[in-house]
């Protein structure tokens, strides 16, 4: 099988996490701060997250590799946002969760970024790293040494 074998499609993982966090928000609310400040933070993140994800998507397409983790990696991508983080798309999805917490002015919703990051780490990222190491060898290991996993 020429793919990393991630546990699920990452945007689906984010969606399930976001829905659960909103359901919890409907039961328990723990405000972060004044709503105006939260709204401003949420707006910044809701612009930043898709911008980061789209930049990563364009960079992967330009490199000629597949984007969906169930398909084989065809190239090692080091340009665009991949110069600063090895996982810009997962970082963007985590930022969306934080944005949701700010929009709802809810600490609990915001803190749902923790289980999301843990699921991404163990269910997606570590699997992708093993796969990319096996597929690309030393060039990928060098990239891992030079660029952080998250930020």
Which role fits each region the language model picked out?
Residues 82:
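Solvent-exposed interhelical
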Residues 1-79, 91-151:
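Membrane-anchoring alpha-helices and their flanking helix-loop junctions
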